Amino acid sequence: MLPLFVAVSMKKEKDPFFERFLAKCSAIGYIKNQEEERTIALKKILLLATGGTIASTPGEEGLEPSLQSDGLAHMIGGITANYEVDFKDILNLDSSNIQPEEWQLIAGQIGQMHSGYDGIVVTHGTDTMAYTASILSFMLHNIPIPIVLTGSQLPILHPLTDGVENLRCAFAMAASGAPGVFVAFNRKVILGARAVKVRTTGFDAFESVNAPYAAIVDSTGLRLNKEVLPVLTGPFRPEQGLCSNVVLVKLTPGLNPEIFDMLLHMNYK
């Protein structure tokens, strides 16, 4: 957890009561001299924009992802002032159109650029965010920095958007040093392979399946659950090979078993 700093200009005329107050506050970490505060290095974060509701504006057929990363940067200046942030556009899609080719592109960009950053935030549409987070967890196994996906239920330009708070949480997680892939949403952080979207309109859109939250935001700040966080088990070697011939079949009473023969003839693995 990052300490709370209050910058104080030292008075030229010493007041004994004021001096005792400063000494006590310094002892518990609440006050830092302004010169000392300026020496604290900002975490370097990369934001990769892929589109989604968070980057959408009204169009002829409803919301359309059209806002570029520089537009996002303008809207969240109060957040990025606390970090050294670079922005890059790699996609501008409604996430319902995300395909395995896009997963390979996102993973490839992260694999190429991760060594220059303390963490990476990926803005993404909510419809398929859980799918992307899950596949990236395997494609980026043992990545040594936090990769945090986030988005919003309302566009960043909407006056009641949840996007700003979600990005605030995502940046905090990206700066935490915890390795792995995560989803940050509604002040909760979920392991990438455990996230599922359970609500289409509510801000509390994602839940964690069969695992506690990796972190939450409360009155103490970002609180990590160290028992849940991934542990590096070897060197990072990004995986680019994907098999798209995969289908999910939900078994129900009366299901015709010949469907499996049909799938085999269609080259599903």
Named regions from a protein language model:
Residues 43, 48-49, 75-79, 191-269:
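Accessory alpha-helical/coil subdomains and C-terminal extensions
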Residues 51-52, 121, 170, 187:
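Buried hydrophobic positions in well-ordered alpha/beta secondary-structure cores of metabolic enzymes
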Residues 117-129, 266-269:
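Short acidic, glycine-rich surface-loop motifs adjacent to enzyme active sites
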Residues 40-112:
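ATP/NTP phosphate-donor binding region
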Residues 125-145:
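Short Gly/Thr/Asp-enriched flexible loops that form oxyanion-binding sites at enzyme active sites
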Residues 17, 23-32, 36-38:
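Short, positively charged and aromatic/hydrophobic N-terminal segments
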Residues 149-219:
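Internal gly/pro-rich beta-alpha loop/helix module
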